[in-house]
Amino acid sequence: MITPDGQRTMRTHLGAAMTLSPDEVTPADFAGAKHAHIEGYLLFNPALADKVASTARAAGCTISLELSSFEVVNVARDWILAQLQLGVDIVFANEDEARALFQKDAAYDAYARQLAGYGGIACVKIGKDGAWVARGAEFHRIAPVKVARLTDTTGAGDAWAGGFLYGHLRGLSLAASGALGSALGAECVQHLGPAIPDHQWPRLRALATALT
């Protein structure tokens, strides 16, 4: 449901995703992979999420985790904190998800620093106000990209994470990876639905090249 201000409300139905069994996840699924991204809604099936995380680690993959929704965090908070202790290389959260995880109100940069305290990269997205990215003592405020018209925020967080991962896995700095994430998120919200139109990708790829 999209309101005139471009904001969306979703009631999630996971469908066939909830029928997947941990036994269906095998080392062969990660052959040749160097990174595994775990999307938060998988955490409604904790046994499957455990198998994905453990198998990815055994295959030598780095791991990123997208918290996806404060509702996900409310259900899977213990699992998330346990995985952070084990070691998650990159965590993506927005302000509501970080608040639910740490169960306190704090400044957005404080959430990023606390997440980074687990040893990985923390990306705390704050919508139209940009994001904070932290790793150890390294800390960056990622500026938002202005948009001509806000149409639909569905998928913006995923686009941001996708841009960041694309940059990071190709060796870009944290700041440059965050800038690419911000650009993809900004492009996403200007279109109805979560997909960025094909004709926009040459410009976005050129931006990624320019950031290297």
Located regions from the model:
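Residues at alpha-helix caps and immediate loop-helix transition turns in enzyme cores, especially N-
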Residues: 48-49, 76-77, 200
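Active-site-adjacent beta->alpha loops and helix N-cap segments on the catalytic face
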Residues: 45-53
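Conserved phosphate/ATP/ADP-binding segment of small-molecule kinases
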Residues: 53-62, 68-141
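Conserved post-catalytic alpha-helical subdomain immediately downstream of the catalytic base
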Residues: 117-124, 128, 145-211
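Short glycine-rich anion-binding loops that position phosphate/pyrophosphate groups of nucleotides
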Residues: 5-7, 15-16, 41-43, 70, ...
